[in-house]
């Protein structure tokens, strides 16, 4: 059995128009190109660490949007000019973006994965 009590009141900053790579240095950033709700946070912040702690079955509440259950967690790392996962899949940045943000999931939380001191070694999608 697992019980997680986590309450964070997060301020969400929109990305500047035309800058889909912008992530606010603190807090959460709303990803402008997501078909649903895409929220980004650096893994060095409390928000990013909270994203990384989520597991399938956990519930995330977004005020005015509702409750969402975590159904999948995907980990991707950068290999050459592609993104790779543990299952051996290899995708371009555009392919990964469509897969994650193309509309299958109404809410996506994203942070980076640190590995060996490289804080942007990979990407974590919840």
Where are the language model's segments positioned?
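Solvent-exposed, non-transmembrane regions of membrane-associated and secreted proteins
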Residues: 1-126
